[in-house]
Amino acid sequence: MTGMTSNGRRPLLNRRLTEFGTTIFAEMSALALSTDSINLGQGFPDTDGPEEIREAAVRALRDGRGNQYPPGPGVPELRTAIAAHQKHHYGLSYDPDREVLVTAGATEAIAASLLALVEPGDEVIALEPYYDSYAAGIAMAGGTRVPVTLRPHEGRFRLDLDELRDAVTDNTRLLLLNTPHNPTGTVLSREELGEIAKLAVERDLLVVTDEVYEHLVFDDAEHVPLAGFPGMRERTVTIGSAGKTFSFTGWKVGWITSTPDLVTAVRSAKQFLTYVASGPFQYAVAEALALPDTYFEAFRADLRAKRDLLAAGLTAAGFEVFRPAGTYFVTTDIRPLGESDGFAFCRALPERAGVVAIPNAVFYDHREEGAPFVRFAFCKRTEVLEAAARRLRAAR
């Protein structure tokens, strides 16, 4: 029997992971290739980041820096740069030797944090819809996932703070937050974060915050790290990443910043995952984090223009568009098109329009909540987005 051991007693896959098969990203990317469609599904840029940072990686390779195992916590140059970044942008002070840990991207940072801090029986609250690795990480740690759903209201997806409070029980160990939020593009406000901080202190909760889109906020939105609120530094693990900010997603360089005790705990799990990774790229990312503010401003402006281009094209094609305040994803409602099943819609869209998108329902425990929503990525070249908009309008 497929998937069974030779004696047929139980499936090969650990039962904690039985709900996680091939990801929707693999399925839709394969569809994009087989239909020669424009892939606006998976969130990676179609151009590389700054040339001087690529050259920094080449220089590190040639100089023999990082070609062997780098230090377990990360190379000192990168840890120092991460601490300087947090101080410069947010006024948060971290000791690069004791309060910074470099990881193999944010995905490992999430997994290591959950494996380190969560035990069987612990409840973990996550904002739904959520990045798919959250569910897998909680499952691998043996925790119980408790979703709190963001729902559309007045053009954006909003958090119901009362619902969040009600979700906390005596078994709640940890809040897993993501702001700017993938896939909805919501950026939690200073006021919302203040209430979350009060709740965490009151109920003595740990918090892991995924802030990989920290520099991709638009219009009047503001990214405010939760660790800066009263009582939060000592209970918050903050996750960052180079991939989204510098358009080098393949380098897999992420990090956490937290207290010495929390960093030590996460490192205890991380060292048995990758141990170390991305040696030469760590030196390059250290230089990237030191780029002038003008780099971050220009990057935001470019993505804001692309957001507006794709949002306008989607609106013209008949979608209801939730204009994101952050990230590089646009969530749409397909019901104005006479559709209600995001899975069926996305599987048919490549043949129908030559464009690939992702059904948001894959990011929900409550699949019915996400059924009519579809996500498009706009971290692509302008001409690609223009072509996608034309195809969608023509297929209307």
Q: Which ranges hold each PLM region?
A:
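PLP-dependent enzyme catalytic core of the Aspartate aminotransferase-like
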Residues: 2, 166, 348-357, 362-396
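N-terminal small-domain helix-loop-helix segment of the aminotransferase-like
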Residues: 5-9, 14-105, 112, 160-163, ...
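Conserved core segment of the aminotransferase class I/II
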Residues: 7, 229, 233-304, 313, ...
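Active-site phosphate-binding strand-loop segment of PLP-dependent enzymes
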Residues: 146, 150-219
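Conserved glycine-rich beta-strand-loop-beta hairpin in the small C-terminal domain of fold type I
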Residues: 286, 302-311, 321-334
